[in-house]
Amino acid sequence: WRTVTALTLHSGLGHLAGNVVFGALFGLFAGRILGSGVAWFAIIATGALGNLLNTLVLVPDHRSIGASTAVFAALGIVAGYVWRAKLMSQERWVYRNGPIVGGLALLMYTGTGDENTDIGAHLFGFLCGFGGGALLTLTRDRILEDRWQWLGGGGAIAIILGAWGIALLS
């Protein structure tokens, strides 16, 4: 549950504002491709998975807070989906791999900062999102159906509420 609740905690208004702005932007892009419900389910799920991997790889006392893992998961979802679905021209190397290069460039430009920046969380969020986005291409004929959008959106809300319910009862 901590991998999910950490996505909703922030160290201050500046931290929150940055995650809201970039989260809304990358979330909008993911929603345009996958539909809003499926996109937000994928963002929450791969963001939580990124937090889990970050925790497993880093020292045991590492603490990670903020939605930035999910923000970079959203960026990874878009890059992975566009790359795997071959939505870009496949004629030249630069076009085929443009989504990967573009995603990594945005990760490097926006995902690094001062000493308080959790670069591991950003990287694992992006990688988990990329994998999730690539996997979602296998279902692209169905994911835009209303029932999957409702299930995805409801599932995203249920994951967050469930994690907080467990946290408050612990």
Where are these regions (language model features)?
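A detector for small-residue-rich transmembrane helices and their helix-helix packing motifs
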Residues: 1-170
